[in-house]
From Swiss-Prot:
Chemical reaction(s) catalysed: dUMP + (6R)-5,10-methylene-5,6,7,8-tetrahydrofolate + NADPH + H(+) = dTMP + (6S)-5,6,7,8-tetrahydrofolate + NADP(+)
Keyword Transferase: yes
Domain of life assignment: Bacteria
A GO term for molecular function: NADPH binding
Gene3D superfamilies (UniProt xref): 3.30.1360.170
One GO BP annotation of this record: dTMP biosynthetic process
Cofactor note: Binds 4 FAD per tetramer. Each FAD binding site is formed by three monomers.
Record's protein name: Flavin-dependent thymidylate synthase
Active site as annotated: R182
CDD domains xrefs: ThyX
Biological pathway: Pyrimidine metabolism; dTTP biosynthesis
Keyword Transferase attributed: yes
Residues bound to FAD: S56, R79, H80, R81, E87, D171, L172, N173, H177
Length: 265
């Protein structure tokens, strides 16, 4: 805890506090049965819960993070409405002159066929224009502040690349969902390519933190959801017809789980 993960040029992610771990998930699950009829070992129980979508025990584990990111990242982040957020207020505090400037290779990566390649002779020139725009915007912001214009109105001239900070509290189940959506590992190629690189960097840092606190739960989540795939009924039928499942190198229990998932008696 208190380790600060440096992200982008001026951003960071830091775990402030957490409540619960793998043991809390197990205890929350077993209380439903008064610990009488659940014979599974702890790791097996957690895997069962995650695999079958029994998520309420995961909600017993809660994290609080301190995040610093550009406003355009923050607004995407806050689309996840299952968390509690306290953000730096532009009404009560002065904005700092801290802006995100993408690396030139990232500008090139995100450049489409009909973008401004013809207008700008080089990515270096484009990067310089971004910095100039940011500097000019902040100077205008300061002019408005010095003219005694209220902070909440003066900030309208600041770009989305301005850094903001917030405290973010979220339970493990919804954190897993956040990571899955933002990494887009199981998404079609087109969605992966359009997934914001900046958001993925924060999601990777979240993984580094969560993996240390709930290693058993994270391994199950990674296996079933982060790197797992969903199949349509049509695809399942095609798989069944193409494979001799009994020849798969899986132990009997996992093979039976696979057959059950595919609807094979």
């Amino acid at each position: 805890m208190n380790k600060e993960y440096k992200i982008l040029d001026n951003g960071f992610l830091k775990l402030i506090d957490f409540m619960g771990d793998d043991r809390r998930i197990v205890k929350a699950a077993r209380i439903s049965y008064r610990e009488e009829s659940v014979k599974r070992k702890d790791a097996e129980l957690i895997d069962y819960l995650i695999r079958n979508g029994h998520t309420s025990p995961l909600e017993q584990v809660v994290f609080t993070f301190h995040v610093k990111a550009p406003i355009f990242v923050a607004r995407q982040w806050m689309r996840h409405r299952t968390a509690r957020i306290n953000e730096v207020s532009g009404c009560y505090s002065l904005a700092r002159e801290e802006f995100y400037v993408p690396l030139e290779e990232d500008l090139k990566c995100q450049t489409s066929s009909n973008s401004s390649e013809k207008e700008f002779k080089s990515l270096e020139k484009l990067s310089d224009k971004i910095k100039h725009h940011q500097k000019h915007s902040y100077e205008l912001y300061q002019d408005m502040i010095n003219a005694n214009i209220p902070k909440e109105l003066s900030r309208i001239v600041l770009p989305l690349s301005l850094y903001t900070e917030w405290y973010w509290q979220i339970d493990l189940n919804n954190l897993f969902h956040f990571i899955k959506l933002r990494l887009a590992l199981d998404s079609p190629k087109e969605i992966k390519e359009n997934s914001p690189k900046e958001m993925r960097e924060y999601a990777k840092a979240l993984i580094s933190i969560v993996r240390e606190i709930v290693p058993i739960a994270f391994n199950s989540f990674e296996n079933h959801f982060l790197r797992g795939k969903r199949f349509s009924h049509e695809e399942i039928i095609a798989i069944i017809n193409a494979l001799d499942l009994n020849k798969l190198s899986m132990d009997a229990e996992k093979l039976n789980l696979l057959k059950d998932k595919l609807g094979i008696d």
